[in-house]
Amino acid sequence: MRPGFSQNYPQAEPEPLPMREDANSRIFAFVDDLFFQAKIQETARKLNVKVEFVKAESDLTERIKQNGEEKPSLIIFDLNNNSVKPLSLIPKLKSKHKKTSVIGFLSHVQGDLKQKAHEVGCDMVLPRSAFSQNLPQLLRRHGASEEEETVN
């Protein structure tokens, strides 16, 4: 290497393999904020992970039935989503899907809501900024199929 030159060139990330159109989703999101929907979709696309946005408990139940034996790995809640009432829906989902992780995100100033979300069964509650920052790791961890998890 010549003096004065560094090998710290940015490395291009390899393109993910194309996702099968019939792949079951293991991650569901109750998010109606368009900014966060776009952020989640773009991150999932880059990681080749399928995330489905649902608007009601009935939508989630229907999608889970269509997946057959494969259970959801992660359910994401925007805790400020008034259309689904997360604090009443989370305990119902946790009782039906005990092994499913539930992650909520909210404004960093909503300490009371954070506490209530933990009390009703939310496994992790993050401020919006931390959720955005950790989104790739969360999707990567929960997006692998059950067969891939047993191999790794």
Q: What are the functions of these language-model segments?
A:
Residues 1-12, 16:
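Long, low-complexity intrinsically disordered regions
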Residues 76-93:
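Conserved phosphotransfer microenvironments
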Residues 121-136:
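Output/docking surface of receiver
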Residues 25-34:
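Conserved acidic segment of CheY-like receiver
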Residues 109-124:
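Alpha4 helix (beta4-alpha4-beta5 surface) of REC/receiver domains from two-component response regulators
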Residues 100-108:
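A short, hydrophobic beta-strand element within the central beta-sheet of small alpha/beta folds
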Residues 35-52:
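Two-component/phosphorelay signaling modules centered on CheY-like receiver
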Residues 56-74:
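Acidic, metal-coordinating helix/loop segments flanking the phosphotransfer/catalytic sites
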